[in-house]
């Protein structure tokens, strides 16, 4: 099973999370791709995709993702396992918290992918409906807030990595 971790990062927090995820799962299994430098077309060569996207300003897509956004429509991702993680500021921008994560989930949901890694909303304060499912009980991916809950990020990343590995094992069982 080969995994590609694709991310966009303007302030390095999404990139640092990518590196932590790679180190937990294993550098021999996960290849990092910064969308600033690498084409999203490379996603097609992996069985599993981990995609990291921060939300900017008032619910905007980060610039590296925005630059390749339309290219995602042309990718053949049928049958791939996809785990998403997002970064945002829940207190300063609660009504747009992780909107980009929700938009990425929506964009990929028509591509025949199998999502893993939905994450509980408990412990977060926000009002945006975009990044959640299951009556608001789950985010569509790991939710990180390096502004207000940075002290929880390492534990959340560790737990989420264990969760997605278990969910992938069930898929391949």
UniProtKB/Swiss-Prot annotation:
<dbReference type="InterPro" id="IPR008254">
    <property type="entry name" value="Flavodoxin/NO_synth"/>
</dbReference>
<dbReference type="InterPro" id="IPR029039">
    <property type="entry name" value="Flavoprotein-like_sf"/>
</dbReference>
<dbReference type="InterPro" id="IPR010086">
    <property type="entry name" value="Flavodoxin_lc"/>
</dbReference>
<dbReference type="GO" id="GO:0009055">
    <property type="term" value="F:electron transfer activity"/>
</dbReference>
<dbReference type="Pfam" id="PF00258">
    <property type="entry name" value="Flavodoxin_1"/>
</dbReference>
<keyword id="KW-0249">Electron transport</keyword>
<keyword id="KW-0288">FMN</keyword>
<keyword id="KW-0285">Flavoprotein</keyword>
<comment type="function">
    <text>Low-potential electron donor to a number of redox enzymes.</text>
</comment>
<dbReference type="GO" id="GO:0010181">
    <property type="term" value="F:FMN binding"/>
</dbReference>
<keyword id="KW-0813">Transport</keyword>
<protein>
    <recommendedName>
        <fullName>Flavodoxin 2</fullName>
    </recommendedName>
</protein>
<feature type="domain" description="Flavodoxin-like">
    <location>
        <begin position="3"/>
        <end position="165"/>
    </location>
</feature>
<comment type="similarity">
    <text>Belongs to the flavodoxin family.</text>
</comment>
<dbReference type="InterPro" id="IPR001226">
    <property type="entry name" value="Flavodoxin_CS"/>
</dbReference>
<dbReference type="InterPro" id="IPR050619">
    <property type="entry name" value="Flavodoxin"/>
</dbReference>
């Amino acid at each position: 099973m080969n995994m590609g971790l694709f991310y966009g990062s303007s302030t390095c927090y999404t990139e640092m999370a990518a590196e932590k995820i790679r180190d937990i799962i294993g550098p021999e299994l996960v290849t990092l791709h910064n969308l600033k430098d690498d084409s999203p077309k490379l996603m097609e060569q992996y069985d599993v995709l981990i995609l990291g996207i921060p939300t900017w300003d008032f619910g905007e897509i980060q610039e590296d993702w925005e630059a390749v956004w339309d290219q995602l429509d042309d990718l053949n991702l049928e049958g791939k396992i996809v785990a998403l993680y997002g970064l945002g500021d829940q207190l300063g921008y609660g009504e747009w918290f992780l909107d980009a994560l929700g938009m990425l989930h929506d964009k990929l949901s028509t591509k025949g992918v199998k999502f893993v890694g939905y994450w509980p909303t408990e412990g977060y304060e926000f009002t945006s409906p975009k990044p959640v499912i299951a009556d608001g009980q789950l985010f569509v991916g790991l939710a990180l807030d390096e502004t207000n809950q940075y002290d929880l990020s390492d534990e959340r990343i560790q737990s989420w990595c264990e969760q997605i590995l278990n969910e992938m094992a069930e898929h391949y069982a």
